From Swiss-Prot:
Enzyme Commission no: 2.1.1.182
Subcellular location, record wording: Cytoplasm
Family: Belongs to the class I-like SAM-binding methyltransferase superfamily. rRNA adenine N(6)-methyltransferase family. RsmA subfamily.
Organism per entry: Ureaplasma urealyticum serovar 10 (strain ATCC 33699 / Western)
Reactions catalysed: adenosine(1518)/adenosine(1519) in 16S rRNA + 4 S-adenosyl-L-methionine = N(6)-dimethyladenosine(1518)/N(6)-dimethyladenosine(1519) in 16S rRNA + 4 S-adenosyl-L-homocysteine + 4 H(+)
UniProt keyword Zinc present: no
Taxonomic lineage: Bacteria, Bacillati, Mycoplasmatota, Mycoplasmoidales, Mycoplasmoidaceae
Protein name: Ribosomal RNA small subunit methyltransferase A
Length: 281
């Protein structure tokens, strides 16, 4: 389905993209193929597509895998895809992805006889992309995700320590997986054209799970990055006893002038465990 066909279909069916749902349809055949190719899909892989929209990427994915599961909230697009993609390996759910138990859904379509990898390939709705990313990384079954998000979001997810974009969300995501920005996508490749640029990012090795309470760690990270220009010690002393914070810095041989942006993701988890274990004793 090329850009002319998509635009004509939208016009013929008087389809008005929903701003509330963050609908921007990818038009470029080159970008669609590029996304599918970087995902390195085999027939045995189970592919989960979140927000398939008009089916631009869907029609390529369905040719690559024996099992494609899509989640679409918009009833209009759900009805369109049920008619447009008529393949036995295509399964579509009409629901809000934030309300779906992803692992339960995946298990419904998993073939235990195959050495299946579970991959997410999707152009995410930008309005809720951070919430979807958090849902993906918490899955116990998803191996990899190749997702298109707002460029600024991709840069946050993929930021390195000691860089400006490195923040609490960066650390939380990188505690679950490796991240890599694959390529950027110009706004002109979409209809309607968004006001921001986009990028495709790879969330890799999602089975490398860390056992912690994500809500508690997320709250801790927000405290650490509350004021990025303040010393980490000062941010933490707003919540924890200053004596305990100083003892931790000494025990870990940390510079008292460190800021949150200077610390690697895994170290934050150690600091969290230290402070909360001591608090509970």
């Amino acid at each position: 389905m090329n850009k002319t066909v998509i635009k004509n279909k939208l016009k013929q069916e008087s389809f008005v993209p929903s701003k509330k749902m963050g609908q921007n349809f990818l038009l470029s055949n080159e970008i669609k193929n590029k996304i599918v190719n970087v995902a390195n899909i085999s027939k045995d892989d189970l592919i989960l597509e979140i927000g398939p929209g008009w089916g631009a990427i869907t029609e390529l994915l369905v040719q690559k895998t024996d099992t494609l599961v899509a989640i679409e909230l918009d009833k209009r697009l759900y009805a369109h895809l049920k008619t447009y993609i008529k393949a036995p390996n295509f399964h579509i759910i009409n629901n809000d992805v934030l309300c779906v138990d992803l692992d339960k859904l995946i298990l419904d379509y998993t073939n235990t006889k195959k050495n299946q990898k579970i991959k997410v390939v999707a152009n995410l709705p930008y309005a809720i992309s951070s919430k979807i990313v958090l849902k993906i990384i918490q899955s116990k079954l998803i191996n990899d995700a190749y997702i298109m998000v707002q460029k600024e979001m991709a840069e946050r997810i993929g930021a390195k320590v000691n860089t400006r974009g490195y923040n609490a969300f960066t650390v939380l995501v990188q505690l679950f997986c490796k991240t890599k920005i694959l390529f950027q996508v110009n706004a002109k490749e979409f209809h309607p054209q968004p006001k921001v640029q986009s990028a495709v990012i790879h969330l890799e090795n999602l089975h490398n799970k860390v056992d912690f309470d994500i809500e508690q760690v997320s709250k801790f990270l927000r405290i650490c990055f509350l004021n990025k220009r303040k010393k980490l010690k000062n941010n933490l002393s707003n919540i924890y006893d200053i004596k305990l914070v100083n003892e931790m810095f000494i025990d870990y041989n940390l510079d008292m002038n460190l800021r949150a942006e200077n610390i690697e993701p895994k170290m934050f988890l150690e600091l969290f465990n230290y402070l909360n274990k001591s608090n509970n004793e």
